[in-house]
Each structure stands twice: as structure tokens, then as C-alpha cells.
């Protein structure tokens, strides 16, 4: 597998929550193709995009939230060249104008079925023109750009088969058209076929350039964690836990540092984090526990980098099975599993112990639901970080899950398949119910 390609695409900076970031990105592209004053913006979102963007803070807005705000900001001042960081340079004057347009009812939002988990279609109308930009499959993957009914750009999406079995390819200007998930990139298909020993060996084989990039990403997320400790952002999970913990307690420090970083991100601080598998909170969970353990135990930068690589690879492996956005909390289950494996590497363990740690983490947290991105994600991230360390300790002592326990198996491939089926089939109804509870009708 091309490791450089994996890390370039799966581990990169993101500003704010990636779901409203994707909406803002699509809106900023639409604005490029729609001259004049905006008249209306209509959002058509997947269940997951709706719930993950509904209550999360937008960076640079003073704590304002939501996909609709992200869309208007993207139209008014988004920089499409910056991708998921399209709102990096907005100011309060733009925010005030955006709020005025929202209050005037300029933006509508609806949840649509039959689309990939990552799906946002932004339709912008201005004088005499209508533009629809669709992001699908990945948060930064522009599937189609449709201007006045004509497809002018985008990678295209695979249409679901018609009743007669025929399949039609290409982009559509219909936001609610039925689409299947796009195929995984080749490097993720390769990753899915690996066993745990191969993941372990790949992490050990990173080159000097990747080593430095991984350490840079961890430093970025640790800086965000320290912000959360100092100021008590959001729910103040990390800040509060730190105030009641012994400084020398590594388990507690792993927990409150990860929670603090998520506090900052969910509150909408204008501070980028290094993401993993398309999610900033996945990136926090995958990196901060490993970095805190490495710092506390005084291991070399090389060991820390290999541990970070393993964490991202395990996270990516599990997400390649489940999909980008799921009813199960991927920050806890997938990235938590990655962190557990990475901490075993920091502790001087081996591949067998790390795989057992992954199984123990998943046995603990597999049922945790994702009810959207919001301040309380800090609680889930803190829990996952603490459980990752506990699972790593069990692995190091050759304890924890060593035979099938319920749906969890010590073999990562078997458990990944079970997790994928539970997420896509078992919890699908739960996702729909959650969106109803969150008010996911058109408004």
C-alpha cells in the first residue's frame, strides 16, 4: 500500500467540524458560479451530515452553530481553494450579515434518503441563475457542479440500479436522486485486506518525512488540548477533569487532554486540528492519547511517530469497513481502537498485544451511538481515550479479549466485519429515529 498516499488523504488539517466544513466548501464553490446577490440557499443532506452539523460551533462566529449558517458563510465569504478550511478568514461583519439572511428565511435544510453517508447538495439561486454543488462520498469530494441545469464539473457519482437492473453513471442535478456509496480509493481497498500484523509492520516502516508529518499533527492537536485546559471551552470536560486529577496520573491525563481538545473543536474555536479518516474528532482521539502516553513515558520521537502511524492505520482500517459517517460513534470505536494499538506500541508491546487491545476497546465501546457533533462529544472522546489506555494495559498484561466475546473477536478483521454490519444494518433505524428526534424535516 502507498503509505504516503494514505496519510496525505486521510490525515490532514481541518478547521472546525468537517460536516459544516463540507457544506461551506460546497457553498463557496456554488457562489463562484452564481454572480450577483444570493436569493436563496437550499441544503439537501444525508442523515449523518444533518445530525453532525446541526449543533456544532462554526469557527470564527463567536459560538454560532449549524449547517445553515455554514452554507450562508460559504456563499458570502468562503474560499473554495481552501477546501474544508473555506471559512478560515471570515470576520464578524460577514457573520452578522449571514445571521440577517438566516433570520430572513433565506436558507432551507432537508434530510434526503438514498444517498451516501457523506452527502451535501447546496443549491444557490441568484438573479437568473441556479447552481447546485454536491459533495459526496468524502467531505472534500466534489461529485457534481450543475449550473442552470448543465453539469459543468465534479467527479460524478454512481447511480443506484434502476428497477430493470440497468445502471446509469455520471452526475445528476437532482439533489435527492438515489446514489450508492462511491467506491473506496484503491489504497483503502488495499488497507481493508490487511491483517493486523501487516498494519503493525507498515507503521514500523514509515520514512523520515512521514515521521515528521505525524509528529507535527500530534503537536497540532496537543496545542488544541492545552487551549481546552486553560480556558474551559464548550462543556469544559477536559478543564474540569484536569482540575480534579493528580498531575502524575497518566490515565487521567490521557482522558482530560483528549476531552479538552474535543471541547475546543466542538465549541468552534478558530484552531485547526489534524484529522483522521475525514474527522477532526477522530484525529484527536487517534493522536492525543498516544502523544500524552509518549510524553509521559519519555519514549523517542521515532517510537511516538510509529505509534501515531499505527493509530491512524487502525482507525482508517475500521472506517474503510464501516464507512465515513455511521450511527456508531467512530471517534470512540474506530479512533479509540487506533489509540489503544498506538499506546501498546508506546508501552513497548508487540502486534499480538496491540490487536488484543483493539478488541478490548471495541468490546467496551462498540455500542456507543453517534447523536451528532456537539459539545458533549468531549465526554465521548474523553471516555474513548481513557478506555484506550485501559485496553492497552490489558493487552500488555496479556489479558482482555482473547477469544470471541459476544460480537467482538480478537481478530481485527472479524470484528471489523461485525462492526460494519451492525453499523449499516443493525443501527440504521436508530440513526433515522435520532434524526427525527433532532427535527430532521425540511425547515
Swiss-Prot record:
Region feature Disordered, mapped onto this chain: 156-178
One record GO biological process: L-cysteine catabolic process to pyruvate
Sequence similarity: Belongs to the UPF0597 family.
Alphabetical list of Pfam families matching this protein: SDH_alpha
Domain of life (superkingdom): Bacteria
Descriptive protein name: UPF0597 protein Dvul_2496
Source organism: Nitratidesulfovibrio vulgaris (strain DP4) (Desulfovibrio vulgaris)
PANTHER family: UPF0597 PROTEIN YHAM (PTHR30501:SF2)
GO molecular function, one term: L-cysteine desulfhydrase activity
